[in-house]
């Protein structure tokens, strides 16, 4: 549970800097728990804050520790999705076995946690082949596979970046988005 809260905090702070109350509301937990986890993450050099008025606005620090904690948080998010939607285990295992695909994302309702029994499973494959797409969609009829380059300037990719689960290629994802590069905003 402790790791889960820290992971959720990091994944929220990747999107934008937030203060403690906003994080607590977003995560549906109490203020003191969020504050304790934030203090631990600050001590680990993974998170930092800036003061705006009377509030401390926390953000992910672009350090090796911050990068490592975010990578662990992404794997934790994948585990949470597999726990919530056990029928994703088969497709995820199949997707992981394709070494020629450097980046695999689940996006849409499954990534956001709003999937129903009839929801399709939206998957993005970077540099996949059409034959792979057809093979996957034949084996798992609920899969809706998108293939292409991971270009953060693309409207589809920008939409995926708002709500996704990284199945494969966490480092590739953050290298492509430039989040941990020195020139990233």
Where would I find each of the regions flagged by the language model?
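Acidic Asp/Glu-based divalent-cation binding sites
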Residues: 120-122
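Short acidic amphipathic segments
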Residues: 101-107
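Catalytic core of pol beta-like nucleotidyltransferases
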Residues: 1-100, 111-116, 126-185
């Amino acid at each position: 549970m402790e790791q889960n809260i820290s992971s959720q905090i990091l994944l929220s702070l990747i999107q934008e800097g937030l203060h403690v109350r906003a994080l607590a509301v977003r995560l549906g937990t109490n203020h003191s728990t969020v504050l304790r986890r934030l203090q631990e993450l600050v001590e680990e050099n993974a998170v930092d804050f800036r003061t705006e008025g009377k509030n401390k606005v926390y953000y992910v620090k672009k350090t090796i520790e911050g990068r490592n904690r975010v990578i662990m948080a992404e794997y934790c998010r994948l585990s949470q999705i597999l726990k919530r939607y056990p029928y994703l285990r088969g497709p995820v295992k199949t997707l992981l076995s394709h070494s020629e695909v450097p980046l695999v994302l689940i996006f849409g309702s499954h990534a956001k946690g709003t999937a129903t029994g009839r929801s399709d499973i939206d998957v993005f494959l970077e540099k996949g082949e059409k034959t792979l797409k057809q093979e996957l969609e034949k084996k798992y009829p609920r899969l809706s596979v998108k293939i292409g380059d991971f270009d953060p300037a693309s409207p589809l990719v920008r939409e995926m970046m708002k709500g996704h689960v990284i199945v494969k290629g966490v480092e590739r994802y953050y290298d492509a988005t430039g989040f941990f590069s020195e020139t990233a905003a």
